[in-house]
Amino acid sequence: MIREAIIKLSQKQDLTYEEAEQVMNEIMEGQATDVQKSSYLTALSMKGETIDEITASAAGMRAHCIKLLHNMDVLEALGVKIDLPPERSAELLKEIQICFLFAQNYHIAMKYVAPIRKELGIRTVFNILGPLSNPAGANMELMGVYEQELVEPLAQVMAKLGVVRGMVVYGQDKLDEISMSAPTSVCEIRDGWFQSYEITPEQFGYTRCSKEELVGGTPEENAEITKEILRGEERGGKRCAVCLNAGAAIYIAGKAQSMEEGVRMAEQIIDDGRALKKLEQFVEESRK
């Protein structure tokens, strides 16, 4: 199928859902050659992915992952053991309501495309498939994207994959998260209903900061910044960025009636020490 798909894509024709899923199955099962995989990913990227092509690719990738992934380097620097087996991660999620899913332990079939992606050096559909292929099968999700044009299409993809409450965000200063230095484009999902809108830091009582103020450093430096935020020592733009994104997640999870309420809850959880306590618990339990 991959040969036929490459020809079709090179002619700027869209693949059907079934064709895209079949190609992904061939790739994930090691049936495609390196040349075929490279040609397919390049042709798909050059044509531009449709909603059906992304949805089918994510479904195919999900089918090949171990069931039950922003930065694992920071978690490691904080002391979290990140490469736990799936069974232990599932236990942590049940016992303390938090875990980290190390991609290499779940998306084993990615070994067939990882070298190709590195050599190509361009963004491909796999850049967005990871968050869409959550091994836990979460039906509530906050996802950041790297291009404005992906916001609404990926919200539709998430809904087709079973997400009932979700939010796709793009910081207009080219951040794949809710930004403290620019407006953020949002597409919210609720039981098959979509709403697109824009939010700004000022809506939540925050003073906009420069993008440079949010830049981190080494994993160790970022881990220290994280601790300063959770200890209540950092009260500038970095803390506000954390509260905005955590607040959105709290709202999407149904724990707040609005994002405004979610942001206020995030602030309170930091201020009363619950967030720091949860991190310390996560570190301790992950190392048992």
Regions found by a protein language model. Give the residues of each.
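N-terminal glycine-rich anion-binding loops that anchor highly charged ligand groups
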Residues: 1, 9-70, 241
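Glycine-rich anion-binding loops and their surrounding alpha/beta cores
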Residues: 8, 14-15, 63-66, 70, ...
